Amino acid sequence: MLLLFLNSVGFIVPVLLAVALLTLIERKMLGYMHVRKGPNNVGPYGLLQPIADGFKLLIKETLKPSNASPYLFYSSPALFLFLAILLWSIIPVGESTLNFNLSLVLILGLSSLSVYSLLGSGWSSNS
């Protein structure tokens, strides 16, 4: 069980670090194209900017429309996150992870369910 956890973490952490680094590189390149430095205030050379962006995202206030259905308004993004994590669990990482013969069909089926999350988000705002 511990080996499976470490194997999964060893797969997910480098992917997340690569996404953070590529986002930083993209922002730096866009800054240089606009004749400015890009993110450079957070940490040396702006290397901690993705961490600051993630922290800022976590502390943002959630705004709910006044006439929105609260249950559907909050459960739709949770459904989307659940489906995304479920899709990640199908990817074979080691010997003891999920490995189906019909995993492509399962991926297509689960990804088609994300439409209901978007539909619920729009419907819950009553607009």
Swiss-Prot record:
Top EC class of this enzyme: translocase
InterPro entries membership: NADH_UbQ_OxRdtase_su1/FPO (IPR001694), NADH_UbQ_OxRdtase_su1_CS (IPR018086)
Cysteine pairings via disulfide bonds: none
Residue stretches spanning the membrane: 2-22, 71-91, 100-120
One Pfam assignment: NADHdh
Parts forming coiled coils: none
Keyword presence, Nucleotide-binding: no
Taxonomy, superkingdom: Eukaryota
Keyword Transmembrane part of the UniProt annotation: yes
A GO biological process held by the record: aerobic respiration
GO cellular component: mitochondrial inner membrane
Subcellular compartments: Mitochondrion inner membrane
GO function terms (MF aspect): NADH dehydrogenase (ubiquinone) activity
Family, as annotated: Belongs to the complex I subunit 1 family.
Protein name according to UniProt: NADH-ubiquinone oxidoreductase chain 1
Gene source species: Asterias forbesi (Forbes' starfish)
